[in-house]
Amino acid sequence: MEQTEPTNIATEGQIQNSPSSAESFLMAMPSFLNTVYSNGWHFPFGYGACIYIRDLMTGDLLQSSQNYTIHFKYWAQDKYQGDGYVFSQFVNTYYFQQVLACNNMIGAVNPDNATDQQLGYLGAGLAFRAMCYLDMARMYEFLPNDKVSSINAEGNDVKGLTVPIVTAEMNQADALNNPRATHEEMFNFIEDDLNKAEQNIVNLTDTRSNVLPDLACVYGLKARLYMWNENYDKAAEYARKAINTAKVSPMTEYDCTNYKTGFNDISKWMWGSQQTSENSTVKTGIVNWTSWLSNQTTYGYVGYGEANNDYNEIDKRMYERISDTDFRKLEFKAPEGSELADKVIQIPDMKELAAERMPAYSSVKFRPNEGNASDPNIGAASAYPLMRVEEMYFIEAEATAHSNPAKGKELVESFMRTYRDPNYTCNVTSTDDVIEEIVFQKRVELWGEGQTFFDIKRLNYSVTRGYPGTNWYDLTRLNTDGRPAWMNLVLLSTEGNNNQAVRGMNNPDPSDVYTIWKEQ
């Protein structure tokens, strides 16, 4: 990947206060979610790749082997995560370029003389930027862990530092002397963006089939923001606002398990990313969401294309903890002899290959578009979720449980019995145990959607991949005591080279600090 200055800012020539330019800036934001970097690697396909990376860094989603996973395996193995490697470079560069697309939109609208339509566009730009910065803040904020001190190699304490804030109004001189924001500074910045988004996005009359955020999404982003800030009363309040305002309901069993439309139908979500046959990601055939997440195609990096291809699996112990009466268990291939084995819905044309090649615990959650397993021009022209209303139910339940575990328990039981498992009961009562149970059910719900990373890091939960009978392959069997050191992502070296305020203030390299677990 060619090194690109991550804190580029829009030039005055890019910003023109006209309806046509505002429209082009508006649609550039969802378009940039699916951007391929032509650098020889097959992981850089935009926002969806970052979702996948975050889940690979948890203890929930694993690649079955490292046969064809060279493009993503180092995030799972905690290798080469320092500032000089392409892996840290991709995430860092992608997000700041997405911010640039947002800043172009924001800078294109003067609120003092804008039309209602342009104010709606501004609201969308602010919401998009808030999503990006909230993701980055939670990925790059240095939090205490079991292996790496917050005192970096230069002797500076980076605890609580996030990333530099780049705005549409920032000049080049300030961008080149722009320090990492503290947690409080970043929180205030994102909250301000979301307050303005809330005010303006009501003027957005068309979300283009959910590729643009609406007011419910702004409420959902506020719920996520307040969870990060541990302002749980506010998080519960805005999660409920998101639920009440959303134009969608929780997905049904049919929605989730249909082999043609399961988790590829953007109409079921509050906000998503939609690819078409014209997207560069789809045109590559293999550098896209479906190729890496679906498991059910003959053309992807995972799936049936080769006899020894890799598959995305759910952690075995996580799978075993899911009740057999919870239909979400059918989003994964059951082991041989299980009563659920015949209930997991496979793509009809692929049943024979699924039986022959797909290992137990493999995901069938993300279906190729139209259930097309053989033509990437159709199957990869799919959608993936950015925000689902189900997440808001779990945020409301967890946030409530921090101060009232009995009420939190009641909320998670209500959601689960109504939408997922009629026999569900939360069998714990203490605050910590109720929170852990709610978060577990949220992890099951959002498996593969890139959100679990944030909860593991925020709540200081351990990641345990090495245990008797584990389905993690050897180099990924890493166990942590509390949040993993690798969840404090490292800024790429170019940021420090070009931004003097960041020089010497990077997070320490967390690579190779854990010992691989070996069965005795």
Label each PLM-derived region with a short phrase.
Residues 1-53, 301-313, 318-324, 328-333, ...:
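Membrane-proximal, proline-rich intrinsically disordered regions
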Residues 187, 232, 405-406:
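TPR-repeat structural position
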